[in-house]
């Protein structure tokens, strides 16, 4: 006897089969294959690849800060990465508020600076909006009748630069006066044993009120292995003799101990991709969030640049500076480096003396004319404060190198802060050796050079087009060896750079 299937059950069976076919098979209770890649590049810092095996976390903070009492707002142990910081404060004046960030139990914080500076609000300027890959700030200019909201309410401060950590991370706020506000820290918690980048977040701040035309203004200076992720810089014009932008631009002196090379800027706005001064446009990577144009020689402003598409890598050191006028400057740089990484030791003169200028730097023929008497005179021991050359009495300048770099652009200037061109100078340093030995002198520069060791000419270099490093075979005597270098400065591809790098391999 055959059992008849009721029509309604037959209909349900057909419907179920069709549904399974449409969905691609029966529903699985657990997917064995992980649909995500093991890592993904950070959108603000693509050079960092971060794990995808994480739990999404948020730590919130209700801030009631007593004067002078630090408040810990975040303290995580284990491995993780902060992806987003957000803060708001009821007080309009937070100039006395500071932030510290310490990762993996470092001896000192990787970040310690005024809160507003860290979030790109520089030189005490009124809060302004920032819409970039790394920083996003939302000032609230809305005036309401609500007595609880200040007439110019505190901005929403946001950071999107990742802060990875393998052992833990701690964030502390401190203020000299009472503060009330809130914060949210969005972060990812990694499982134990996760493979995490060795690079750790750092930030540095520099301020000069005013700057000195004879000294480069520091933006970032660090030793080790890492990369520059971005920076924000502000200008307040005090000197009305010329436009605030006309300062000769920035210099990046990279890997002095291992592979000296340079990146040279142009002028202020040009270094950020702009033209003809401050103009308030913002993109993910470059922008001008603030300007106050009161006249051609009376302007203030802020620029930012994040190097997501073109990070600046360094493997032993970075010295990042700007030429300066007697204006106010403030800069904050954001970079990542491997903790504890150090450059290899370098044999180089620890002190230099320089004398000049001489008017023979315009042609190679004039530059190479014999000066035996002068060379013998300058190769004898330390120079006094003044050196007489012919009828001229020239001042001797004492210089100390940074990572082997000797900077000359601030010593001789036609008009600040531009270095003289078509002039030459002599530099003198001492190389000490414990024995008589053969060695290699590594000399990097972007001009001409004549090199003397213990009064003997050992090399003539023509690097007039761009910065190049030469390796010169030399023989060092036991004890002190007198190194004398004649060099010049001309306009070339490096634009206004007047620096040399010297070391013995």
How does the language model describe each region?
Residues 30-345:
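Beta-strand-centric surfaces of beta-sandwich/beta-rich domains
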Residues 159, 304, 427-429, 468-472:
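Short strand-edge motifs at loop-to-beta-strand transitions and within beta-strands
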Residues 341-413, 430, 482-505:
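Accessory carbohydrate-binding/adhesion or oligomerization-edge regions at the termini
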Residues 433, 437-452, 483:
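Aromatic-lined ligand-binding clefts that engage carbohydrates, nucleic acids, or primary amines
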Residues 452-472:
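Solvent-exposed beta-strand/loop surfaces of large extracellular or lumenal domains
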């Amino acid at each position: 006897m055959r059992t008849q299937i009721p029509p309604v059950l037959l209909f349900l069976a057909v419907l179920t089969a069709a549904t399974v076919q449409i969905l691609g098979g029966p529903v699985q209770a657990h997917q064995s294959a992980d649909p995500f890649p093991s890592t993904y590049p950070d959108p603000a810092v693509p050079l960092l690849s971060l794990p995808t095996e994480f739990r999404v976390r948020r730590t919130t903070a209700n801030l009631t800060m007593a004067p002078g009492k630090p408040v810990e707002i975040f303290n995580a142990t284990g491995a993780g990465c902060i992806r987003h910081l957000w803060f708001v404060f009821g007080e309009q004046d937070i100039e006395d508020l500071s932030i510290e960030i310490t990762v993996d139990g470092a001896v000192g914080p990787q970040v310690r600076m005024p809160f507003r500076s860290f979030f790109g609000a520089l030189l005490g300027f009124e809060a302004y909006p920032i819409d970039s890959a790394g920083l996003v700030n939302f000032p609230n200019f809305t005036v309401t009748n609500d007595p609880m909201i200040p007439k110019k309410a505190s901005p929403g401060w946001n950071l999107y630069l990742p802060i990875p950590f393998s052992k833990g991370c701690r964030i502390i706020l401190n203020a000299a006066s009472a503060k009330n506000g809130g914060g949210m820290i969005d972060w990812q918690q990694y499982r134990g044993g996760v493979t995490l980048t060795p690079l750790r977040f750092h930030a540095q701040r520099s301020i000069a009120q005013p700057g000195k035309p004879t000294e480069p203004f520091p933006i970032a200076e660090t030793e080790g292995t890492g990369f520059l992720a971005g920076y924000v810089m502000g200008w307040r014009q005090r000197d009305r003799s010329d436009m605030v932008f006309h300062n000769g631009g920035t210099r990046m002196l990279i890997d002095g101990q291992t592979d000296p090379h340079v990146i040279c800027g142009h002028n202020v706005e040009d270094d950020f991709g702009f033209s003809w001064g401050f103009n308030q446009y913002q993109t993910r990577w470059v922008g001008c969030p603030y300007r106050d144009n009161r006249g051609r020689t009376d302007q203030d402003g802020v620029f930012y640049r994040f190097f997501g598409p073109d990070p600046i890598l360094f493997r032993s050191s970075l010295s990042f500076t700007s030429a300066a006028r007697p204006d106010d400057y403030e800069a904050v740089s954001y970079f990542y480096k491997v903790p504890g990484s150090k450059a290899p030791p370098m044999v180089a003169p620890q002190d230099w003396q320089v004398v000049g200028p001489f008017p023979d730097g315009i042609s190679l023929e004039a530059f190479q004319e014999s000066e035996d008497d002068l060379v013998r005179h300058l190769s004898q021991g330390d120079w006094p404060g003044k050196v007489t050359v012919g009828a001229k009495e020239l001042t001797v300048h004492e210089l100390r190198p940074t990572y082997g770099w000797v900077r000359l652009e601030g010593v001789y200037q036609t008009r600040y802060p531009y270095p003289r061109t078509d002039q030459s100078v002599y530099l003198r340093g001492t190389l000490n050796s414990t024995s008589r030995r053969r060695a290699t002198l590594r000399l990097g520069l972007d001009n001409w050079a004549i090199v003397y060791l213990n009064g003997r000419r050992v090399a003539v270099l023509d690097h007039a087009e761009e910065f190049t490093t030469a390796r010169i075979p030399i023989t060092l005597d036991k004890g002190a060896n007198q190194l004398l270098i004649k060099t010049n400065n001309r306009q070339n591809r490096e634009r206004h750079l007047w620096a040399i790098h010297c070391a013995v391999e």
